A protein has these predicted regions:
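Cysteine-dependent hydrolase recognition
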Residues: 1, 6-226
């Protein structure tokens, strides 16, 4: 496996792959490129296969690097094999006013949740789907926020979010925000899987919410697939 060390936005040597397209809606940055090691691979991202795993520590300073290495070692050496390692949570958006994805994200999340329940019945699957909660007069879902907070504090092996997002929050209702992440305090660190936009945009000039999940030295999460 390969580990990229830096936030691409602050990397003088630009150790990242940028797509050829310059238009914002078509352009993207990815580290997958560095794992296409076979001859003539790397020109077709939808077809070519990575030859090894690639991860990135989105660090900007020596202090952050030290903290993240310590955090990783602490997680790997954690002997607490309590029930938290059997807990997984799926959070699903209900779309927004500008699209027709009223149930799409929930269906996608539920397919994954049901697959785990079928193939790994030992896991306790928690489902936090927006439509199952009451919307406030301000158009937000305070109970969704509270449930996410409660589940994270109780300990989760994995938390999965499917829906709209940005560099600072989940969903247009802002059910989980960068402020929540930075203020979080819980012992057991989950793996975060986020099927959303921009949440861990490591080449942004500002630190994204997903990066802060990892950079939180004592809470947040231990890794992200995003």
């Amino acid at each position: 496996s390969t580990l990229m060390r830096s936030s691409a936005a602050s990397d003088v040597y630009k150790r990242q792959f940028q797509s050829q397209e310059s238009l914002n809606v078509y352009s993207y940055a990815t580290d997958d490129y560095f794992a296409f090691l076979e001859d003539n691979s790397g020109s077709n991202f939808s077809r070519d296969k990575m030859c090894l795993g690639v991860g990135r520590f989105p660090i900007r300073t020596v202090t952050e690097a030290t903290q993240m290495v310590d955090k990783t070692i602490s997680y790997m050496e954690n002997k607490d094999s309590g029930s938290w390692k059997n807990n997984v949570t799926f959070v699903a958006d209900d779309g927004n006013n500008e699209d027709s994805f009223t149930t799409n994200h929930m269906k996608q999340a539920d397919q994954l949740a049901e697959a785990i329940e079928e193939m790994q019945p030992g896991f306790l699957v928690n489902k936090v789907y927006f439509d199952a909660y009451k919307r406030s007069s301000l158009g937000t879902y305070p109970d969704v926020h509270n449930e996410i907070e409660k589940l994270l504090k109780s300990g989760q092996l994995l938390i999965n979010y499917t829906g709209h997002g940005s560099t600072t929050h989940w969903a247009d209702e802002s059910v989980w925000t960068q402020t929540d992440i930075n203020n979080s305090s819980y012992k057991h660190l989950p793996v975060w899987v986020t099927a959303t936009c921009d949440f861990t945009r490591f080449d942004d000039l500002n630190t994204s919410a997903g990066e802060d999940v990892f950079l939180n030295k004592s809470s947040g999460g231990i890794a992200l697939f995003t």
